[in-house]
Amino acid sequence: MRRAVVLFSGGLDSTASLYWALKHYDEVIMLTINYGSQEERVTNKVAEFFSRELNVPLKIVKIDFLHEFSKIAGSKLVEGNVPEVTARELEDFEKAKETARSVWIPARNFVLIGVAASLLDALGGGDIIVGFNKEEGETFPDNTKEFVDRINSALKYATMNEVRVVAPLIELDKKGIARLLKELNAKYEYSNSCYNPQGFTEDGKPIHCGRCESCVRRHRGLIEGIGEDKTVYLVTPKV
């Protein structure tokens, strides 16, 4: 039996990865990890929605130390105002790197993969499904194929059972992810990409700020990829 744990943060990437995993594995478990980021005020509800919608078991784990370390690092994801960007600024590599640094969570993906690996090792092994993609890999080094390859090398020594990381979106940009979501009939409008979400609509859709980097990337990818965006925004991003 093929088993997978999907690291689910609630955004487009992990939502696409979740739907993909359900097509490729016999047993799928969602794992959402709370570390004190500002978007967690909606993340858990998003995870619970997809768990119910897709009938997938969900585990929510809290790790307080990562919140503490992120505050030391000055990450705007856990404290302060997240930077606002335009679509044009995203094309400026130095500006994009600067924005990435401001929301960086110290060794986040390394830590989260470790938690997922521990769960899978306890269950007898399996694959960790992550939403790493080509577009974010340009500014976040822990979203790259090189990172996945090196993590998988380490996991051979770190677990008693066979555990590996699988990144089905690694060659895709946001446009490609949008097309995959449409192909999989995913209810992406119930996912949340926003660093500073504004609550929910009456029917349970997250309200995105429309101003942060993640909102701009999301809207641009959906419009350019499938020609529509069902996401609810406080302010519609300009692309």
From Swiss-Prot:
Keyword Membrane tagged: no
Catalytic activities: 7-carboxy-7-deazaguanine + NH4(+) + ATP = 7-cyano-7-deazaguanine + ADP + phosphate + H2O + H(+)
Record bears the keyword Cytoplasm: no
Cystine pairs: none
Binding annotation for Zn(2+): 194, 209, 212, 215
HAMAP family, alphabetized: QueC
Family (UniProt): Belongs to the QueC family.
Record's protein name: 7-cyano-7-deazaguanine synthase
The species this protein was found in: Pyrococcus abyssi (strain GE5 / Orsay)
Gene: queC
